[in-house]
């Protein structure tokens, strides 16, 4: 059965916009769990623009499901992860000027750095995922680096402007999922997925988990966080029937 990882970053974005203590991403995470989330995803960025260290520290002991911590491949962030010991960590690229993660991690280009991080995290009992574009070379490099999980970047699919372009990107994701599975990897997917485009990705055989945040937080403004999570989970499950 396909799983849903709910990303709570944008609850923290709203909090940080005014420098208040609310809305509380911890509360959002617990509501998401009660609504059917299988994991809670959060990205502790180097610039701390939304999620803060304290959020991660509190959440690590509060979750009943899994914490999936997104992190840049830097000594500071890997060191933090080794101290917190999340269940899962997803290594992602990061640029300070970007609004959101704009593409997959170039594992092939930064192979030694990524491989070293994978080994350090694995030795600490943390399951490592690499957020990569739907490119064969990146999947091959992920296998060589020792990551047991990859998350396919679905942003190009989500941003497609025409039906033909979207279909082409969907086929790229399907091929990447198949290649990952053939290598024995667990394959997740995420980025840019929302209520109108999620089902085609959820229906791909072998996809283990989708990580979705912005769309759920946006929907929650109108229907509440619990319902927003349930609606997304139901769409995913329907697509797999």
Curated annotation (Swiss-Prot):
Q: Could you tell me which CDD domains the record lists for this protein?
A: PNPsynthase (cd00003)
Q: Which reaction does it catalyse?
A: 3-amino-2-oxopropyl phosphate + 1-deoxy-D-xylulose 5-phosphate = pyridoxine 5'-phosphate + phosphate + 2 H2O + H(+)
Give, as in the UniProt entry, the pathway in which the protein acts.
Cofactor biosynthesis; pyridoxine 5'-phosphate biosynthesis; pyridoxine 5'-phosphate from D-erythrose 4-phosphate: step 5/5
> What Enzyme Commission number(s) appear in the record?
2.6.99.2
Q: Which GO terms describe its molecular function?
A: pyridoxine 5'-phosphate synthase activity
Task: Name the source's superkingdom.
Answer: Bacteria
Swiss-Prot/TrEMBL keywords: Cytoplasm, Pyridoxine biosynthesis, Transferase
- Keyword check for Transport: no
* Binding-site residues, 1-deoxy-D-xylulose 5-phosphate: 9-10, 45, 50, 100
Q: Which GO terms describe its cellular component?
A: cytosol
Q: Where does 3-amino-2-oxopropyl phosphate bind?
A: 7, 18, 192, 213-214
One family name in Pfam for this protein: PdxJ
Residues with site note (Transition state stabilizer): 151
Active site annotation, chain numbering: 43, 70, 191
Q: Which InterPro entries match?
A: Aldolase_TIM (IPR013785), PyrdxlP_synth_PdxJ (IPR004569), Pyridoxine-5'_phos_synth (IPR036130)
Q: Which PANTHER family does the UniProt entry name for this protein?
A: PYRIDOXINE 5'-PHOSPHATE SYNTHASE (PTHR30456:SF0)
Oligomeric and partner information: Homooctamer; tetramer of dimers.
Looking up NCBIfam families in the UniProt record yields: pdxJ, PRK05265.1-1, PRK05265.1-3, PRK05265.1-5
What does the sequence similarity comment in the record state about its family? Belongs to the PNP synthase family.
State its role: Catalyzes the complicated ring closure reaction between the two acyclic compounds 1-deoxy-D-xylulose-5-phosphate (DXP) and 3-amino-2-oxopropyl phosphate (1-amino-acetone-3-phosphate or AAP) to form pyridoxine 5'-phosphate (PNP) and inorganic phosphate.
The name this protein goes by in its record: Pyridoxine 5'-phosphate synthase
